[in-house]
């Protein structure tokens, strides 16, 4: 499973990139809205200067025709921009049109296996099932990853699964076990993955022994 960082904060992206494990970035309107110091397009240019992998940039339009035009504008910013489209009927139309133009797409706000299957059939490069938000309403978001992976494998679909709305390290472990191709998460979760109390204790013991 590859690691994406879910943020529009350039400092966080650079820090994640320095770890040597960053394969891409996902953003959304909520994350971009937190970045008051720069325009959306300028921030995307900054991000694509740092990251060579996929950078998902979400449209804010809701009508298919407007999504398509906005998607073309976003894709023109850099060759590694992936246009992020919400899972709606208009979104599916936009995905098909953008795919036909050779533009990569990431269908977001996936909460059912049927939604993921529709997005894949429309030509989506990626689908993003949301784990944490399903957990919040008493459903098991990780089961959705398993369902989508099985369906894609059975039908030979190339669309990749991005496990999104990752809240903690256990989400990462389980998403990887269940076959997600990518996990996108905040920098704080990536940092949590590096930690274990026995690792810290081992380092302390090594240093104590060395300094005797």
UniProtKB/Swiss-Prot annotation:
Reactions listed under catalytic activity: D-sedoheptulose 7-phosphate + D-glyceraldehyde 3-phosphate = D-erythrose 4-phosphate + beta-D-fructose 6-phosphate
Q: Which domain of life is it from?
A: Bacteria
Alphabetical keyword list: Cytoplasm, Pentose shunt, Schiff base, Transferase
What family, per the record?
Belongs to the transaldolase family. Type 3B subfamily.
Question: Taxonomy-wise, where does this protein's organism fall, top ranks first?
Answer: Bacteria, Bacillati, Bacillota, Bacilli, Bacillales
Predominantly, its location class is: cytoplasm
Annotated signal sequence is none
Q: Which organism is it from?
A: Bacillus pumilus (strain SAFR-032)
Please identify the protein, giving its name as recorded.
Probable transaldolase
């Amino acid at each position: 499973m590859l690691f994406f960082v879910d943020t529009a904060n350039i400092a966080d992206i650079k820090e994640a990139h320095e770890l040597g494990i960053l394969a891409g970035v996902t953003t959304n309107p909520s994350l971009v809205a937190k970045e008051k110091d720069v325009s959306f397009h300028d921030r995307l240019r900054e991000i694509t200067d740092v990251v060579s992998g996929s950078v998902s940039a979400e449209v804010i339009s809701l009508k298919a025709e407007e999504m398509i035009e906005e998607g073309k504008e976003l894709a023109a910013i850099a060759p590694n921009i992936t246009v992020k489209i919400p899972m709606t009927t208009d979104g599916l139309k936009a995905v098909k049109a953008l795919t036909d133009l050779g533009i990569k797409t990431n269908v977001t706000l996936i909460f059912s296996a049927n939604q993921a299957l529709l997005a894949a059939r429309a030509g989506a490069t990626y689908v993003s099932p949301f784990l944490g938000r399903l957990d919040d309403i008493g459903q098991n978001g990780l089961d959705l990853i398993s369902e989508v992976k099985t369906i894609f494998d059975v039908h030979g679909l190339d669309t990749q699964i991005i496990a999104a709305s990752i809240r903690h390290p256990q989400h990462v472990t389980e998403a990887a076990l269940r076959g997600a191709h990518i996990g996108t998460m905040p920098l704080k979760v990536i940092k949590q993955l590096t930690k274990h109390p026995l690792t810290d204790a081992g380092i302390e013991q090594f240093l104590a022994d060395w300094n005797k």
